[in-house]
Swiss-Prot record:
NCBIfam families: PRK02265.1. InterPro entries: Acetoacetate_decarboxylase, Acetoacetate_decarboxylase_bac, ADC_dom_sf. The gene is adc. GO terms for molecular function: acetoacetate decarboxylase activity. This is Acetoacetate decarboxylase. Belongs to the ADC family. The active site is at 116 (schiff-base intermediate with acetoacetate). Catalyzes the conversion of acetoacetate to acetone and carbon dioxide. Keywords: Decarboxylase, Lyase, Schiff base. It catalyses: acetoacetate + H(+) = acetone + CO2.
């Protein structure tokens, strides 16, 4: 293969059969269970990178079911998102996500900088409640429940919340092990079509694990729970801060 061909074809590895396709990345009937809880502010300060700022000691614990996604297929994801501000702009910082499908793990890490790891999350309706779980190996590290569709939420308000900015810390090492990419990335969910939004009584239990440390941000109080279904496009990102250029 000629050098010019390598340059023109290079998108993702392997060169001749990339682990994920080019976008746009559209999700149909993407389903969220988001349980917001109050946690230890000191622990948040230890893990949220500057220049992001913590506004309140809150965490969104998310279980996300994605049965129909462009190029990524059928998978489920779970993890923690922390409400933050960047230059006065409110958004969410994704701390870690755990999922069961290789293409979105590879694409998420390489394109945007999503902190994704392989695990076994689930999200489904269990009789009268919606149930989310996360297993890392053989250990159950997260269990979330919410009463099924107890009360409608305002669709327009929830669409605005989904459309807000999200922040990622993208880290890619050089071949010698030093940092080659260390950037704060901002991205948005786009073309959102809300199909439903509900709330109800909720619970969240987190268990310690050395490699899936969701319990390092302890649950002190449940603040809010939301069950959302929407079609949306996962927009590509932009670098808002380059740690290596400072």
């Amino acid at each position: 293969m000629k050098i010019s061909d390598v340059r023109s074809k290079a998108f993702a590895m392997p060169l001749t059969s990339p682990a994920f396709p080019m976008g746009p990345y559209r999700f149909v009937d993407r389903e969220f269970l988001i349980i917001t809880y109050r946690t230890d502010p000191d622990r948040l300060r230890e893990i949220v990178p500057e220049p992001l700022q913590i506004t309140e000691p809150l965490v969104h614990y998310e279980f996300i079911r994605m049965a129909d996604s462009t190029g990524f297929g059928d998978y489920t994801e779970s993890g923690q998102v922390i409400p933050v501000e960047y230059n006065g702009q409110a958004g969410g910082y994704t701390l870690a996500m755990y999922l069961d499908d290789h293409p979105p793990i590879a694409g998420g890490r390489e394109l945007w900088g999503f902190p994704k790891k392989l695990a076994s999350p689930t999200l489904h309706v269990n009789t009268d409640h919606i149930l989310g779980t996360l297993d890392y190996g053989k250990v159950r590290v997260a269990t979330g429940t919410m009463g099924y569709k107890h009360k409608d939420l305002d669709i327009e308000e929830q669409a605005k919340r989904l459309a807000g900015p999200n922040f990622l810390l993208k880290i890619i090492p050089h071949v010698d092990g030093t940092a080659r990419v260390c950037e704060l990335v901002r991205y948005y969910m786009q073309d959102i079509k809300m199909k439903g939004a509900w709330t109800g009584p909720a619970s969240l239990e987190l268990a310690p694990h050395a490699l899936a440390p969701v319990a390092d941000l302890p649950v002190l109080e449940i603040v809010e729970a939301r069950h959302i279904v929407a079609d949306l496009t996962l927009g590509l990102g932009e670098v808002v801060y380059d740690y290596l250029a400072q």
